[in-house]
Amino acid sequence: MRVEDMKGGYTTGSCATAGMKAGLLALLEHDIVDKVVIENPQGQFIEVPIKSVEIISETEAKATVMKDGGDDPDVTHGNDVETTVTLDDTGKLRFRAGFGVGTVTKPGLAMPPGQPAINPGPRAMMKLVFEEFCTQGQGVTVTVSVPNGKVLAKKTLNHTLGIEGGISIIGTTGIVKPMSEEGFKNSLVPQLKVMKANGCETAVLVPGRIGQDLAEQVLGIHKNQMAETSNFIGFMLEQAVHIGFKRILIIGHIGKLIKLASGSFHTHNRMSDGRMESIVAYAALEGASQAVCEELFNCQITESTFPILEREGLTGVYQRVVDRASMRSERYIANEAEVGIIITTLKGEILAMDKHAKEIGELEHCHIPCIS
């Protein structure tokens, strides 16, 4: 299916804003609606269906909206967002995190510690609703809840970022665009901002669980100093430099990081896969015969090359990989930061590390094991 044929949706921020408007309509105009139109900060209007509205008292109402992310994969898709509005005479708009909505506990995010994890975009949209409905002296407390939020939060980076108790209510435009790779990439960046705000001098980048487990369990690096990159290693390198890191350590499986050595910084197999070609090239530089090169070339996965490299005395390939990956990574970010590389097996055993990784490890007091 083409992207242009796919259905868009709306964010959790739009759900909460729509729920707020439906609740105020019920309280102030005695109007129970099944849809509302809200305005985003860019001046666009979004129609959002309302699942239910309940008047709790003369000053309190709750509206429920089912999150619809369209054709964009999203952990919150199909889940209810409940917004309770409570009228008061403070003249102010206040926000509270209900069940399943997180609270910020670390600096470096869009909202300061102690605040509900309701981002500036949704707050701005709710402020527009507040200004539309509330007269001078009338105040509203908006409590946003997501019944399944604590479970959903485990599938997000919230705990790593320091958001505890549930998911975040997000959205800058209120609209979810289908197949939003940019949106996913941008969701990774706050990890780096939190690390910097908490005084980390080195950014440790891990594509996935293998690198993360090694960093934490073997090297003694705290998980708060690590950022997951998924396949977007190049993007996260650029972001780390932009945020101000001068030292970057990348830890991961050789099958992923060998791609950096050949200059491929989007590491999804569909985008870049020259693993065997690279191993053969480095093996040849180590003196491998044509027959051995052909044997290596016919391997389907990098792990299958290990016994051959060991048998032929070609394990120097691993050092060539990390040295080249470090050089190419530093070149990728115009040498604005020092980049160290550590490559591992699927079991998390270290195969090699370059000199920058050793230097960074010493500065960070990591438990660097001896490699034979």
What are these regions (language model features)?
Residues 1-155, 159-161:
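Generic N-terminal targeting/processing segments that precede catalytic cores or assembly contacts
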Residues 7-13, 161, 167, 172-191, ...:
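A structural signal for small-residue-enriched, beta-sheet-centric alpha/beta enzyme cores
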Residues 88, 123, 322, 326-372:
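Extended hydrophobic packing segments that form well-structured cores
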Residues 105, 152-154, 215, 260, ...:
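Short acidic, gly/pro-rich beta-turn/loop elements at beta-sheet edges
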Residues 99, 162, 230-231, 364-368, ...:
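Proteins with a high burden of low-complexity, intrinsically disordered sequence enriched in S/T/G/P/A and R
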